[in-house]
């Protein structure tokens, strides 16, 4: 149900967003707007974006967190940091959009094993939490 919405909103043209996943994330409204003046630093939700895509990413992130242990762990950690439900889903959506951007750029389908290897290689804090909370298996 969400795949057609994502395809319609994002498209499959690898040149559309250039070489930077941040362009797609800003377009989708998941990237926050940061501004500062003097000693004041603030972060706000991005309103200049495709609202249809932002809503689609919100629904996708919520579905993903329910279906994925990795997604649920990521979401729970963001909530523990004091983020609202919607903000935690936008953060998860940021990660998912980065993966989609790479899939579009490389013209390859999602590879869960490759994603797991990359997370291990880069020292993902989500994997560290998953490994810490995993039940010990008897030898």
Segments and roles (model prediction):
Residues 66-139:
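Acidic, carboxylate-rich catalytic segments that either coordinate divalent cations
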Residues 1-2:
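Coiled-coil termination/hinge junctions
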Residues 5-85, 131-139:
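Phosphate-backbone recognition surface of nucleic-acid-processing proteins
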């Amino acid at each position: 149900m969400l795949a057609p919405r994502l395809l319609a909103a994002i498209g499959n043209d690898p040149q559309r967003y250039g070489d930077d996943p941040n362009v797609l994330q800003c377009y989708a409204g998941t990237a926050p707007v940061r501004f500062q003046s003097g000693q004041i630093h603030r972060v706000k939700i991005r309103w200049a974006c495709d609202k249809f895509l932002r809503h689609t990413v919100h629904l996708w992130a919520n579905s993903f967190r329910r279906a994925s242990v990795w997604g649920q762990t990521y979401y729970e950690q963001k909530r523990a940091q004091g983020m609202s439900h919607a903000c935690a889903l936008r953060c998860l959506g940021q990660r998912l959009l980065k993966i989609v951007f790479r899939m579009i750029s490389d013209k390859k389908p999602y590879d869960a094993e490759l994603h797991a290897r990359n997370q291990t290689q880069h020292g993902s804090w989500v994997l560290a939490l998953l490994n810490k909370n995993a039940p010990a298996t008897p030898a």
